[in-house]
Amino acid sequence: MPQNEYMEEHRKRHGRRLDYEEKKRKRTAREAHKASADAQKIFGHKAKLHHARRHAEKVQMKKTLKAHDERNVKQKDDGAVKEGALPAYLLDRDGQKDAKALSSAVKDRRKDRAAKYSVPLPKVRGIAEEEMFKVIKTGKSKSKSWKRMVNKATFVGEGFTRKPVKLERFIRPMGLRMTKANVTHPELKTTFQLPILGVKKNPQSPLYTSLGVLTKGTILEVNVSELGMVTTGGKVVWSKYAQITNNPENDGCINSVLLV
């Protein structure tokens, strides 16, 4: 047994290898690939134990993420103020456990803002799942069919990174990804090509909204800073909503009307 911390002592005296950080980064990046390869090789009782351990890890991860999300939830705290500690004119106020309650309320209001506009296309044709998705066969013998490829145009954002192959259920092809939209101003009767900031609401399904699918009637958020629009208070308007009026997958472009 070693009597001293000779490894730490050597590190303090001479430092680490010059490529230590790079090697560590690459090793960490390959861990997911190694875990995937190991999971495919093992079988029998060892595989059962491995899957049970991974399942427990994922459950714990979900609980941790949920705990982080609950910090932003507005909750009434009855024990914050004791009886008789407040003057009469403050008794109607509730104690708040979370300081982020106001910001959460603002975010929720922003989410529902798309419903307040009278849109050019109030009704659109429903799209069947067979038309929206193509089934992708996977596995060694192509017997698994849990993956789907989106047949419609999509928007994924600038910092988008695909999930690992084992976890990516919905594939959005590069050729159908859109970043700009032709936006027509209804009052000026002029058309501008503006960058898309996000998909606010797809009338077909919340799933299509989360995937960023662009179909006829979808509400987009576009960057209107080039138009020089200002609010009544004199502030510059950076983004506004627009509704798609064509079928982007057929035309190869997005035509939309600005909601003013």
From Swiss-Prot:
A motif (Nuclear localization signal) lies at residues 11-18. Transmembrane segments: none annotated. It holds the Pfam family Ribosomal_S8e. Gene3D superfamilies: 2.40.10.310. GO terms for cellular component: nucleolus; preribosome, large subunit precursor. Residues 17-36, 66-79 have a biased composition (Basic and acidic residues). Residues 1-37, 60-79 are annotated as: Disordered. Keywords: Nucleus, Ribonucleoprotein, Ribosome biogenesis, rRNA processing. It comes from the Eukaryota. GO terms for biological process: maturation of 5.8S rRNA; maturation of 5.8S rRNA from tricistronic rRNA transcript (SSU-rRNA, 5.8S rRNA, LSU-rRNA); maturation of LSU-rRNA; maturation of LSU-rRNA from tricistronic rRNA transcript (SSU-rRNA, 5.8S rRNA, LSU-rRNA). CDD domains: NSA2. InterPro entries: NSA2_fam, Ribosomal_Se8/biogenesis_NSA2. Component of the pre-66S ribosomal particle. Interacts with NOP7 and RRP1. Interacts with RSA4 (via WD repeats). PANTHER family: RIBOSOME BIOGENESIS PROTEIN NSA2 HOMOLOG. Involved in the biogenesis of the 60S ribosomal subunit. May play a part in the quality control of pre-60S particles. This is Ribosome biogenesis protein NSA2. It comes from Cryptococcus neoformans var. neoformans serotype D (strain JEC21 / ATCC MYA-565). The gene is NSA2.
